[in-house]
A protein has these predicted regions:
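Alpha-helix C-caps/helix-loop-beta hinges
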Residues: 21, 47-48
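Short amphipathic alpha-helical interaction segments
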Residues: 32-46, 59-62
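A short, conserved structural fragment
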Residues: 48-57
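Short amphipathic alpha-helical interface segments
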Residues: 3-23
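Basic, amphipathic "hinge/linker" alpha-helix immediately C-terminal to the N-terminal HTH DNA-binding motif
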Residues: 64-74
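Short acidic, hydrophobic short linear motifs in intrinsically disordered regions
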Residues: 21-32
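Phosphate-centric recognition/catalysis
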Residues: 73-138
Length: 138
């Protein structure tokens, strides 16, 4: 069987946001990242790492997304409770801080250095911890 391709920086950012703040709308993801995430959300849907899980009861009824069993299997998790707790679970502003972007870049560099095709659970968790720490310091 073909090994899944490595996730890009935007895909890791979107996946981390949805994993920790689910159910999340694309507009919410866009607000946190500060850029349009339509393409990345569709890519994660194609890879079955996220799925639609209803609509938000506000005008326009935006689609909400959550992670899938494929996401859990890909990162060696039994359930979402195994994700480490984030110290601050409410982003204060609509942009990823430079520190958060740097955390994801370090994750990408570690992937490239190891020549791995998949993100390991520890890499995802480390990036999430660094993102949370950056949020707290912001």
């Amino acid at each position: 069987s073909r090994r899944p391709a490595r996730l890009s920086q935007p895909a890791l950012e979107v996946l981390a946001i949805i994993a920790y703040y689910q159910p999340a709308t694309r507009a919410y993801v866009d607000q946190i990242r500060g850029v349009d995430s339509s393409y990345t959300v569709s890519l994660l849907l194609e890879r079955d790492l996220i799925e639609e899980c209803g609509r938000l009861a506000v005008p326009g009824r935006p689609i909400q997304y959550r992670t899938t069993q494929t996401f859990l299997r890909s990162f060696g998790l039994s359930n979402l409770d195994e994700l480490p707790e984030l110290p601050n679970t409410t982003p204060e502003d609509g942009q990823l801080t430079l520190e958060m972007q740097a955390a994801v870049e370090r994750l990408q560099a570690a992937q490239a250095a190891e020549g791995t095709e998949e993100v390991t659970e520890e890499e995802l968790l480390q990036a999430a911890r660094e993102m949370a720490q950056a949020e707290e310091e912001a």
